[in-house]
A protein has these predicted regions:
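Transmembrane beta-barrel strands of outer-membrane/channel proteins
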Residues: 109-117, 150-154, 182-186
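N-terminal signal peptide c-region/cleavage motif recognized by signal peptidases
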Residues: 26-28
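Residues on the lipid-exposed face of transmembrane beta-strands in outer-membrane beta-barrel proteins
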Residues: 135-141, 169-175, 182, 209-215
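N-terminal secretory signal peptides that target proteins for export/translocation
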Residues: 1-15
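Transmembrane beta-barrel outer-membrane domains
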Residues: 104, 128-132, 160-166, 200-204
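N-terminal propeptides
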Residues: 32-57, 76-112
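Short loop/turn motifs that connect adjacent beta-strands in outer-membrane beta-barrel proteins
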Residues: 60-62, 83-85, 97-109, 141-148, ...
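Surface-exposed coil loops of outer-membrane beta-barrel proteins
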Residues: 114-124, 162, 185-223
Length: 223
């Protein structure tokens, strides 16, 4: 479906879009505090894959979102003294990332602006805009049992005509070693980075309920 470029520009810079942009620009810019890592952060995935490959951690990385608590549990038993070079740098980045993301009791705001001349319909693992222009804002809060992640996106001239989108919004609750979540969560299944034949992020997330383990440690019995 082709769009008139002049109409697209006028739509993106409409008074409503400008008002939302100015309003969100007044919000402090910080990252979210979330116990689940959604697909999109290519550097985090590369660091985790490297640490997996050299035997520092042992966590499944083929079904996203992944549990950061699982990564933390594996990382805290690692012997960092034997690391050097790229492995040491990856270890430090992941450790700092976990310290920030798993901090509890603090509400955090975030704001993003993305523009793309030719949005990709076939998307890879890396987070990319689905439309020609997007303004995104969110609020997240985490404690020892519950998580709330609110996200709203205004899209310029979207393909499906839905200008306001709740993609990324979800609420969750820890139930023992399980995390129960409900909302619009991005999912990625498979080892690929340029695409997934199982489940990828080409389509926008649909509302659903997800139950996954917080820690991937093996069961104590064979049953």
């Amino acid at each position: 479906m082709l769009h008139d470029p002049v109409q697209t520009i006028d739509s993106f810079f409409s008074p409503r879009a400008w008002f939302l942009t100015v309003l969100l620009a007044c919000v402090p810019l910080t990252a979210a505090a979330l116990p689940l890592a959604a697909p999109g952060d290519m550097r985090l995935r590369h660091d985790l894959q490297l640490l997996n490959d050299i035997g520092v951690i042992n966590v499944p990385l083929t079904a996203w979102p992944i549990s950061l608590g699982d990564v933390h549990n594996s990382l805290k038993t690692a012997d960092a003294s034997r690391l050097s070079g790229a492995g040491k740098e990856a270890y430090n980045r992941v450790r700092d990332h976990l310290a920030w993301e798993l901090e509890t009791g603090t509400a955090r705001y975030r704001f993003g602006l993305a523009v793309s001349e030719n949005p990709r319909f076939i998307r890879g693992f890396e987070n990319e805009p689905r439309e020609e222009g997007e303004v995104t804002a969110g609020l997240s809060w985490l404690d020892n049992r519950f998580v709330i992640n609110l996200a709203a996106t205004y899209a310029s001239n979207p393909f499906d005509d839905e200008e306001f989108q709740p993609d990324g919004t979800y609420v969750g609750m820890a139930l023992g070693n399980w995390m129960l979540t409900a909302g619009w969560q991005e999912r990625w299944w498979g080892p690929g980075r340029d695409g997934s034949l199982i489940l990828g992020t080409n389509a926008k997330p649909t509302p659903g309920i997800m139950l996954q383990r917080n820690l991937s440690t093996p069961f104590e019995t064979k049953w």
